[in-house]
Amino acid sequence: MTQTLENLSNQTAQLNMPRDIARFNMIEQQIRTWDVLDPTVLQLLNDVPRERFVPAEYQGLAFADIEIPLGQDSNGQLQSMLSPKLEGRILQALNVQKHQYILHVGTGSGYFTALLASLAKHVTSIEIDADLSAQAAKNLAKVNINNVTLIVADGILGQPSDNANVLFDVIVYTGSSPREPAGVREQLVIGGLLLMVLGNAPAMQASLIQRVSETGFREDVLFETCLPALMNAPQIKRFEF
């Protein structure tokens, strides 16, 4: 059975007081102050134990306003968790519902996958690095979240080609891309949402794209941020004179 928010809350209540204080301060001083006010999101970030997904050497920073390192992937690129405030802002924008099916690209530690899975019907989460995906599976098992399918693949173009006919209510990338990969928005159901961080450092923007009809889409820029680029992300073509 999928772990419920109530069960997770009971689980985290057993943590020692200093950790609980750090978690409270994370929510009140980092997340709320970044205009994340949705009570469901705030409760979720309190209930899903972030520290269970943080590497042992960074446990003291589990609730800090930083992108916690996860080590290097097979190509030597540094991987990291999203900062807590960015996790909250993205969740608030997506407004995930319990009947929804989600595609998540960039599993990482599995924590953001866990947040999504605690709200949704099912999450398909893609990670290009096999070691990270394996660790994410262990982390998710620690908190009894099992409505997740983990896939080791290059997810820059969305779902694997052998699932090309599957559409999602929500698609979210937790890494950046200089430009939107072709064909990803077409993997949404009508009414579905795609959230990506687009651009090159230091000028990146979180964009929310909604499919409003079979061929129509609406795009809104939510906020400015900066994230490491996903491997094999499409580059902006530059004109040569």
Task: List each language-model region with its residue ranges.
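Catalytic, metal-anchored helix/loop core of enzyme active sites in primary metabolism
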Residues: 241
